[in-house]
A protein has these predicted regions:
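A conserved, positively charged/aromatic
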Residues: 15, 22, 32-44, 176
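Short hydrophobic "strand-cap" motifs at the C-terminus of beta-strands
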Residues: 23, 48, 68, 102-104, ...
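Conserved donor-binding/catalytic core segment of Leloir-type glycosyltransferases
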Residues: 94-110, 116-119, 133-134
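Carbohydrate-associated surface elements
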Residues: 51, 71
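A short helix/loop element that forms part of the nucleotide-sugar donor recognition site in Leloir-type
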Residues: 78-93
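An aromatic- and histidine-rich active-site surface loop
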Residues: 1-15, 28-34
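A short beta-strand/loop micro-motif in the catalytic core of glycosyltransferases
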Residues: 41-50, 66
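Nucleotide-activated donor-binding/catalytic signature segment of Leloir-type glycosyltransferases, i.e.
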Residues: 13, 144-171, 175
């Protein structure tokens, strides 16, 4: 809520014309009682997790709230049959490899470059042909590190680290998972 104080400072002007709904996530306990004024400045708080819903219900029980799961389509993101997995891995030269998948924004706070350094240390122990790291991200994000430069600097240019930077369909993303 701290990023939107300006909005809640004018909530009486907004709510006179339209309801205010806050789509919210809060990740941990203890209850953030200091958020009560912000929660109560909404007509509804839509909570992304059960924990968030519990927080809102306990910090501001008088505000209307609901739990709206932050989730994926279970018809797309579901377990595959072993034969389909084997075929997918084989088509990408991932047979008999330990595969790690990182699906994230390449932002410094996400430690994307550090992950590659750690992965190299892992490969140095198990063998560079035994594992692959797939990173679904923008390798040259202005808020991140130059991941391509890092893999070159570390000598990880033989398929140890693979990048998937294009926008992909949910089905294609589910396949990687």
């Amino acid at each position: 809520p701290r990023f939107y104080r300006w909005l809640w400072e004018i909530e009486h002007e907004i709510r006179a014309h339209v309801p205010m709904v806050y789509y919210h996530v809060w990740d941990n306990y203890p209850y953030p009682k200091f958020n009560a004024p912000w929660y109560n400045s909404n007509d509804h708080v839509a909570c992304i997790s059960k924990l968030t819903h519990d927080v809102v219900q306990n910090v501001a029980p008088e505000v209307d709230s609901s739990y709206i799961p932050h989730a994926v389509d279970a018809e797309i993101f579901k377990p595959w049959e072993p034969d389909a997995i084997e075929e997918y891995r084989s088509a990408r030269n991932l047979d008999n490899k330990f595969v790690c998948f990182w699906n994230n924004r390449n932002a410094r706070r996400k430690q994307s470059g550090t992950l590659i350094f750690w992965f190299k240390e892992f490969l140095d122990k198990v063998g560079h042909d035994k594992a692959t790291l797939i990173m679904h991200t923008d390798i040259k994000d202005v808020h991140g590190q130059d991941l391509e430069a890092i893999i070159h600097e570390l000598g990880l240019t033989n398929g140890q680290v693979l990048f998937s930077g294009d926008k992909v369909s949910s089905a294609d993303l589910a396949a990687i998972y």
